[in-house]
Amino acid sequence: MENKYMVAFAQNLKELMGNMSVTEFSKKIGIPQQTLSRYLLCQREISLNYLCKIADYFEEDIDVLLGRKDY
């Protein structure tokens, strides 16, 4: 089920990834490519473990990634 946090997360992650491909980014952070694709398409809610991995990689606050705070 798509919700506002999933949509905000997908938009923010796409922005942070820039020109990096899903394949490249998934390998860098150790998330299966298909799982990452589903996050970006708002087809799957992100796990806390993967959310932390992504936040750590980009050195970004989790609340910012989820759209609960502005950059």
Regions found by a protein language model. Name each.
Residues 16, 48-49:
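Short, Lys/Arg-enriched C-terminal cap helix and immediately downstream tail that follows
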